Structures are given as C-alpha cells and as structure tokens.
A protein has these predicted regions:
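N-terminal [4Fe-4S]-dependent radical SAM core
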Residues: 1-5, 48-51
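Conserved, mostly hydrophobic/aromatic
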Residues: 12, 16, 58, 93
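Radical SAM/AdoMet-radical enzyme domain recognition
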Residues: 39, 43-44, 48-57, 66-146
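Canonical Radical SAM [4Fe-4S] cluster-binding loop centered on the CxxxCxxC motif
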Residues: 3-33
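Active-site neighborhood of divalent metal-dependent phosphoester/pyrophosphate hydrolases
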Residues: 61-62
C-alpha cells in the first residue's frame, strides 16, 4: 500500500527541537485547485490498481493550520472524484493537537480518521508554542485540548 505523507501546509504554531519544519514568513498551504488534481491522481491510480489502497497522512507544519476548509474540500473530493475508489483511500493525521476542536474532529471522523498521531515530551525545552520553546505553555494547551 503506498503511503503519502501529505504536507498540507508549511505553517506551524509550535517550535520543537526535533522538527524539520522551516518557519517561513509566508508559509505555503496547498491551493484547493491543486488539491483537486491530487485527488484526481489518487482516483486514477486506484482505478489502474484495483487491488491497492492509498494511505494519506495529513502532515505539515501543523495540519490544522491549513484550515478546516481544506479538509472539508478533501472530504468532498473523496466523495465526488473518488466515488468508486473511496473505500481504498485511508486517511490519518499527525498533529500537535493544540488547535484541534470539534469541527476538525467531526470532519476527520467522517474521513475515517479515528486516531490522531501526536507526540508528547514531558522534558522542558524540547517543545513549545511560538518562537520561545516554552514547554509549560505547550503542555498546558496540550492537556486543556483534551
């Protein structure tokens, strides 16, 4: 099964020592018209390879910073463009979960995402929100979110 790490956006609200995200002044997010082309390619592949599935892992930056409309549109394209192949599209998401809310959860659930990958580091200074790596602020947000 091909697995695609789909970097929906370069934007991220965290500042973690181990991350390879480059914090740009103007981070890019995939345009919705290009997202449509991606789903057309997914469908073409799945039609050509009827025994295959595609796993798509929404990643980033922070995937939630791409905005809820991106995922609503992806869900729409899954239903419309991939109508006959959608059962072989498997989605996952890797997030720092600090921006997760019920709207994201509802859309992700409809996409078949039932587990959200994240990492948690209790060691101070490894992870933080904003430019300063303040783990206390991050951990507070992390636990309030859930």
């Amino acid at each position: 099964m091909p697995t695609i790490i789909f970097k929906a956006t370069e934007a991220c609200n965290a500042n973690c020592v181990y991350c390879d995200v480059v914090h740009r002044k103007k981070p890019r997010t995939i345009p919705l018209d290009l997202l449509k082309v991606v789903f057309e390619r997914f469908n073409e592949y799945l039609l050509e390879c009827p025994n295959e599935e595609i796993r798509v892992i929404w990643h980033g930056g922070e995937p939630c910073m791409a905005g809820i409309e991106l995922y609503k549109t992806a869900l729409k394209y899954t239903k419309e463009i991939c109508e006959g192949t959608k059962d072989r599209l498997k989605f996952a998401v890797q997030s720092n979960i600090t921006m997760m809310n019920q709207e994201f959860l509802d859309v992700f659930m409809e996409m078949g995402i039932h587990v959200i990958g994240t990492s948690y580091e209790p060691i101070h200074g490894v992870r933080g929100l904003g430019k300063v790596r303040d783990s206390r602020l991050y951990n507070k947000k992390f636990f309030i979110t859930w």
